Amino acid sequence: MANGVIPPPGGASPLPQVRVPLEEPPLSPDVEEEDDDLGKTLAVSRFGDLISKPPAWDPEKPSRSYSERDFEFHRHTSHHTHHPLSARLPPPHKLRRLPPTSGRHTRRKRKKEKTSVPPSEGTPPIQEEGGAGVDEEEEEEEEEEGESEAEPVEPPPSGSPPKAKFSIGSDEDDSPGLPGRAAVTKPLPSVGPRTDKSPQHSGSFPSPRARASRLAGEKSRPWSPSASYDLRERLCPGSALGNPGGPEQQVPTDEAEAQMLGSADLDDMKSHRLEDNPGVRRHLVKKPSRTQGGRGSPSGLAPILRRKKKKKKLDRRPHEVFVELNELMLDRSQEPHWRETARWIKFEEDVEEETERWGKPHVASLSFRSLLELRRTIAHGAALLDLEQTTLPGIAHLVVETMIVSDQIRPEDRASVLRTLLLKHSHPNDDKDSGFFPRNPSSSSMNSVLGNHHPTPSHGPDGAVPTMADDLGEPAPLWPHDPDAKEKPLHMPGGDSHRGKSLKLLEKIPEDAEATVVLVGCVPFLEQPAAAFVRLNEAVLLESVLEVPVPVRFLFVMLGPSHTSTDYHELGRSIATLMSDKLFHEAAYQADDRQDLLSAISEFLDGSIVIPPSEVEGRDLLRSVAAFQRELLRKRREREQTKVEMTTRGGYTAPGKELSLELGGSEATPEDDPLLRTGSIFGGLVRDVRRRYPYYPSDLRDALHSQCVAAVLFIYFAALSPAITFGGLLGEKTEGLMGVSELIVSTAVLGVLFSLLGAQPLLVVGFSGPLLVFEEAFFKFCRAQDLEYLTGRVWVGLWLVVFVLALVAAEGSFLVRYISPFTQEIFAFLISLIFIYETFYKLYKVFTEHPLLPFYPPEGALEGSLEAGLEPNGSALPPTEGPRGPRNQPNTALLSLILMLGTFFIAFFLRKFRNSRFLGGKARRIIGDFGIPISILVMVLVDYSITDTYTQKLTVPTGLSVTSPDKRSWFIPPLGSARPFPPWMMVAAAVPALLVLILIFMETQITALIVSQKARRLLKGSGFHLDLLLIGSLGGLCGLFGLPWLTAATVRSVTHVNALTVMRTAIAPGDKPQIQEVREQRVTGVLIASLVGLSIVMGAVLRRIPLAVLFGIFLYMGVTSLSGIQLSQRLLLILMPAKHHPEQPYVTKVKTWRMHLFTCIQLGCIALLWVVKSTAASLAFPFLLLLTVPLRHCLLPRLFQDRELQALDSEDAEPNFDEDGQDEYNELHMPV
């Protein structure tokens, strides 16, 4: 049998057998006196006196009635089959009594002094695990003495009657035992389950006198060697109870004692003696070193040691959190069930009652009273930490038993509370996922749930918590007024329950997250609130409980009557918000007892904000709350940092603090700063090569992804549009010496070479506004000095290579750290003003050449002029193929104005649409990113549809040819083409080379600095020295071939990095997006540059683009560049009252007049640069721009304090990847 006892014929239950004691040799008087005292104290007669008076019957409390079904269940239940007490007796070699010695006599006296209950006060308790106060070492010494000084037992005289002794819990004698199992005789009458207060128990047992005579008769049987035994010998290790076929079975006591106790007491004894309930605080009892499993031989300890080795180490490492609040509600059929009403990943999301959909994530606002009630609830409720259960019924069973032990609920409410905890769970997404056919989860009655799912106790996998269907009788009604409660569906963990899970929500939950389930509700059968906080030993997947399959680690249960003042909903929100707080849930993982949880609540209250109970009208009144909260969080982090430093001081790390160190407690290893000087010539360049080139194979492998293909198509249009725009304007500025063809070829060649050799291949090289301004200034200078413009650029390029080599050799890239936003804003604001001015100046020239006249030339004259210089649809021929375009054309000015404004407004509207709330985030982002190509395409179609109005078109040659073949070729002679180039200019070209180096250095290095921000999570590093050397050296080659100089384009480079950025999907709703990785590779840059170069074959298409459309793009770039500059925002504050100023650091931390003074200084620098740019000395404007750097670091600290400069000139811009956030123009202080 499973119980290890051979049943007699007929299937009767075994009856314990008792042997007749043998006659013992006379002992000393002291020993006999002690034996007599203990015999009187623990005699059977005292038990008879205790049970002779039955407890009074209370007629008000209902008693349970038992039927034949109850008795049959009791007879055939395995855990009610009791073993004979003789089976717990020690082996035969322990039957010998030791003679008294002086040492033993002294130890007996010492043990008698430790006895807490005198014999006259009552019956001593039966110890759970070893006798209280018994010293382990003394017992081992007694064993050794007993084996060395044992005397043979003499048989009693034949004529003397046997002396019956029956003492329980003897502290003196070693317990005798039997060499084998007791023989089975007749079955013991079974006792049905009953409660302590049932009046039926009085007739179930014989009288004390009859019981005593029966026991005496049993003890007089000849096969009993001794009647003196010790209850301590019945102790066995808890791990030995898990073996179904082992000698140690789950039997709480023997039949004799079972007849004295009720079924409730037997169940309690069984739970107390045989189960190990984690989280339940018990009195510490010193365990004796002797156990029955290891008494006979060392092999008995092997199973115990094996199980100890298999015990897993507690996982105290905090995980990410997912909290779900379930409230007890009634459905449409008035059936109770658990309904999900809120959830937390980081912020709170509530279910809207009317629409049954999730609301927007928000910061949870809690009432101060609910937090105090929660603290009081945890202080007085049940706290089960490190509970070793893996099923919901097992957890619920131990929670209910703990509530009963802590006097939170009555024993008769056990069934109702357990049924309530096991009710089915429903979620808002259940009906949505199932469509027209709602999902019907598997349900079962209480009997099937408890019969099929036995929670596993901590002492062994095979030992199950005793569950018995009839222990609860017929299923008690969950609600007292509901007679059909037994048919209500309960939670069935094993069913198919996750059909309605939300995959989108599951993506937002981190992979290693562990869930917290909060169950709160009102029940009518409780008289007072009952609560329990449970932390499982390890996270387990409780199916059908959560909306998504996330393992559960914490549970909080709160049930109570409705007539109390407790708001269960707010209390559930409070504990859920606490568990979603980072510091509190870390403390919950590391808590050792209840006090740690209470301390964590106090820490949470220290960082909380209390808002007065007044009506708040408008968000402006709550502006101070956010700032105050940031201050509290800062102080909280400082306290945590101080604690971490104290725990790590001296090399000691407190237990449970390893994660805090990983999260920022310990300093990270210093990173390889690419701008750090080595002190050697070309030292920075060598470090860049060693840092970046080892990643070259991965730069090719990482491009094998579909995201790279999408990035290539997007950045191609983003790079082609500026190339066409700046190429057309450059042709206007240089009179056709350089145009679209040269700029496209330069972008393609330099882009491919830089992508293959550069240290940061994510940079996009291209033409920019500052270089356009410089080219125009240098062209005017050469015309004024009667010099060849292209030949002068050759010498400027050669000097540029020399200066770049000298700068890289001296590791001068570190100077970029001194270029603050003060200089960047001046630079960007100046270029934006130039763009806007040039746009309207070009439009003014169109109105001058084609004025609005009341009378135009005759039709024939107009046709003759059109035939002389126009292609069909009014496309202007290249300068070599005919005269300049016609003048005084009707409607040309108006159409040019419409095309320019139409292009600007379409591109600007699509940019605003990108940050709007229409459509999805990805769709808006795609439309917004392609705003410029879309606007160009739309307005080209508009111009193409109007055939009778002339507009000036973009000049693009046919095939791979220069813009003006009659003026130049692809190679520029360094000594001059038409006439010799003056030698003095060969040397003087060093000055413009130095100026163009300033522009290239500032744009390239600032762009590389922006791309290399830590927030962008680039892992392969960058190389400022190598990138500058490549761009400068390639600039020298551009001069020889008559190609425009290029630099790292800020907006296009940042857009390229953003297109290759992979965002984390496991982001809590309402939280800002986080970068998972960036696909750093070289292939996309090569493909983008190649596609731009191949665009030269689209000459027929490019010749259809009107110049007015390019003016609109020029205007768009100028206006959008101003939106991200703090200078433009502070400029508007001059015209705004102080009460309407925004809550920005440069407003709140600086006085208004001093803020305006800083703005005026910047405007003065811009005005000076504009004046220089407008005069003949326009070539020197990069040098004046460079002078703003020493102005910021030398003069401004004398006018402003450090804290003011920190607020006015701080680089606090971070990359924004929110779908509803700002674009690249708002993040950057650099010109387009």
Swiss-Prot record:
Keywords: Anion exchange, Antiport, Cell membrane, Ion transport, Lipoprotein, Membrane, Methylation, Palmitate, Phosphoprotein, Transmembrane, Transmembrane helix, Transport. Residues 76-97, 104-113, 280-289, 305-316 have a biased composition (Basic residues). Residues 1-708, 911-925 are cytoplasmic. GO terms for biological process: pH reduction; regulation of cardiac muscle cell action potential; regulation of intracellular pH. A lipid is attached at residue 1165 (S-palmitoyl cysteine). It comes from the Eukaryota. The keyword rRNA processing does not apply. The chain crosses the membrane at residues 709-731, 737-774, 794-816, 826-847, 893-910, 926-946, 980-1002, 1028-1049, 1083-1128, 1155-1191. Residues 1-316, 429-499 are annotated as: Disordered. Belongs to the anion exchanger (TC 2.A.31) family. This is Anion exchange protein 3. It comes from Plecturocebus moloch. The gene is SLC4A3.
